[in-house]
């Protein structure tokens, strides 16, 4: 899996770049924010690689928070790379975290390809979206980390939230409590 690339920009469009890495030129899809942030010929990008039956796609980001935002929205059922990139082009990670925290459907509907149903689903799925290790409004950092840890173990977000409701403590305590309660469910 490719997680980063450094090379010389051969061509730059608003939604993709051609990056020459040691003589091999890759087409990398980028958000408009990333495209605007590329000022130098030599650039280092954080990469998300999406492998499909018919394509091997690379998505590049200058900012790790933008990459995290993209990776997070891709996990939502019905949200593909095209919509994920549109979200990254429309919002900065900080703005997106505020939109999610305030559950602002109308702001999310501004993104091309997102209607009212999809916007509502995204807001429900991303209730605990975190930027820069700080939790979005209404969620402590330890709670957000515990939720992510339990999700990485394969538990569903709604079950995790039920299990962790009323719990407090540091991340490891919350994970232990969550595991105990999730085993009973």
Curated annotation (Swiss-Prot):
One of its GO terms (cellular component) is Holliday junction helicase complex. Residues 139 are annotated as: Flexible linker. Residues 139-185 are annotated as: Domain III. InterPro entries: DNA_helicase_Holl-junc_RuvA_I (IPR013849), Hlx-hairpin-Hlx_DNA-bd_motif (IPR003583), NA-bd_OB-fold (IPR012340), RuvA (IPR000085), RuvA_2-like (IPR010994), RuvA_C (IPR011114), RuvA_C_sf (IPR036267). It is found in: Cytoplasm. Keywords: Cytoplasm, DNA damage, DNA recombination, DNA repair, DNA-binding. It comes from the Bacteria. Residues 63-139 are annotated as: Domain II. Residues 1-62 are annotated as: Domain I. One of its GO terms (molecular function) is four-way junction helicase activity. One of its GO terms (biological process) is DNA recombination. NCBIfam families: ruvA. Homotetramer. Forms an RuvA(8)-RuvB(12)-Holliday junction (HJ) complex. HJ DNA is sandwiched between 2 RuvA tetramers; dsDNA enters through RuvA and exits via RuvB. An RuvB hexamer assembles on each DNA strand where it exits the tetramer. Each RuvB hexamer is contacted by two RuvA subunits (via domain III) on 2 adjacent RuvB subunits; this complex drives branch migration. In the full resolvosome a probable DNA-RuvA(4)-RuvB(12)-RuvC(2) complex forms which resolves the HJ. Has three domains with a flexible linker between the domains II and III and assumes an 'L' shape. Domain III is highly mobile and contacts RuvB. The RuvA-RuvB-RuvC complex processes Holliday junction (HJ) DNA during genetic recombination and DNA repair, while the RuvA-RuvB complex plays an important role in the rescue of blocked DNA replication forks via replication fork reversal (RFR). RuvA specifically binds to HJ cruciform DNA, conferring on it an open structure. The RuvB hexamer acts as an ATP-dependent pump, pulling dsDNA into and through the RuvAB complex. HJ branch migration allows RuvC to scan DNA until it finds its consensus sequence, where it cleaves and resolves the cruciform DNA. Belongs to the RuvA family. This is Holliday junction branch migration complex subunit RuvA. It comes from Sulfurovum sp. (strain NBC37-1).
């Amino acid at each position: 899996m490719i997680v980063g690339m450094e090379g010389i920009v051969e061509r730059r469009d608003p939604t993709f770049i051609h990056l020459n890495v040691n003589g091999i030129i890759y087409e990398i899809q980028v958000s408009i924010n990333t495209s605007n942030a590329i000022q130098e010929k030599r650039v280092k990008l954080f990469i998300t690689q999406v492998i499909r039956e018919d394509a091997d796609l690379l998505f590049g980001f200058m900012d790790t928070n933008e990459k995290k935002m993209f990776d997070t929205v891709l996990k939502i059922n019905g949200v593909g790379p095209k919509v994920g990139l549109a979200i990254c082009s429309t919002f900065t990670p900080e703005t997106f975290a505020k939109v999610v925290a305030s559950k602002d459907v109308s702001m999310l509907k501004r993104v091309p390809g997102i209607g009212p149903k999809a916007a509502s689903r995204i807001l429900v799925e991303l209730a605990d979206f975190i930027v820069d290790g700080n939790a979005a409004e209404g969620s402590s950092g330890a709670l957000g980390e515990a939720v992510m840890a339990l999700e990485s173990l394969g538990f569903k977000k709604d079950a995790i939230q039920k299990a962790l409701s009323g719990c407090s403590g540091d991340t490891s305590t919350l994970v232990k409590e969550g595991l105990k309660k999730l085993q009973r469910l």
